[in-house]
């Protein structure tokens, strides 16, 4: 709660990254040190745990709160509804773990309908992976372009279909009257 209050005062973005059991493989951690891989997703719970914070600061225009997780089961069930409801909440793409076309697709498919694309944080960089930043940005852009194009084409198709039904209804109404 204190971190959110301070973020509203200083304008810094608050980020929460639960859902990872770090350094799961003891031998790798012993040989190479901490944070060198072996991060395994674990179950997370946001809705109850963030309720007090979001009631206090979730509608505050001075706060931007980015939520991340490796726990894919929470994308649609908790994260997207929270981001769709609270103006301060943004969804962070779990690219550091699911840095693949399929991983990014699962994230977008499970969150876009409820939270929208505008409620996502975009592509944040991690300086620990400095050499891979360019490749990861390329992957994200190469994936996002067709995703947006397909979404636009699908939405346009729905609009044309709705317009056609409307026009057919008008013709039927005229024929009956």
Regions found by a protein language model. Give the residues of each.
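Divalent metal-binding pocket/active-site signature
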Residues: 1-74
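Short acidic/histidine-rich active-site segments
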Residues: 15-19, 66-70, 91-95, 117-136
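Histidine/acidic-residue-rich catalytic or RNA/ligand-binding cores of hydrolases
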Residues: 24-33, 75-83, 101-109, 130-146
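Short acidic (Asp/Glu) and glycine-rich catalytic loops that position anionic groups and cofactors
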Residues: 28-33, 59, 87-90, 120-127, ...
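A long, glycine-enriched binding/interface module in the latter
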Residues: 53-58, 73-94, 105-119
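Acidic, glycine-enriched catalytic cores built around paired aspartates
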Residues: 55, 60-63, 69, 79-82, ...
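C-terminal helical cap
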Residues: 70-76, 91-109, 158-177
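Mid-to-C-terminal alpha-helical segments outside catalytic/metal-binding sites
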Residues: 117-118, 135-177
């Amino acid at each position: 709660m204190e971190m959110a209050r301070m973020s509203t005062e200083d304008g810094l973005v608050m980020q929460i990254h639960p859902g990872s059991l770090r350094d799961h493989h003891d031998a790798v951690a012993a040989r190479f040190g901490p944070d060198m891989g072996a991060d395994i997703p674990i179950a997370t719970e946001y809705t109850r745990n963030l309720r007090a914070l979001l009631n206090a600061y979730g509608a505050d225009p001075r706060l931007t709160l980015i939520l991340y997780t490796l726990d894919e089961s929470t994308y649609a069930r908790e994260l997207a509804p929270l981001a769709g409801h609270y103006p301060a909440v943004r969804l962070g793409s779990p690219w550091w773990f699911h840095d693949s076309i399929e991983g990014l697709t699962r994230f977008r498919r499970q969150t876009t309908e409820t939270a929208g694309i505008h409620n996502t944080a975009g592509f944040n960089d991690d300086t620990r992976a400095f050499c891979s930043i360019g490749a990861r940005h390329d992957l994200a852009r190469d994936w996002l372009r067709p995703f947006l194009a397909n979404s636009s084409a699908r939405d346009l198709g729905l609009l044309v279909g709705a317009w056609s039904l409307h026009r057919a209804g008008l013709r039927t109404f005229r024929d009956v009257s």
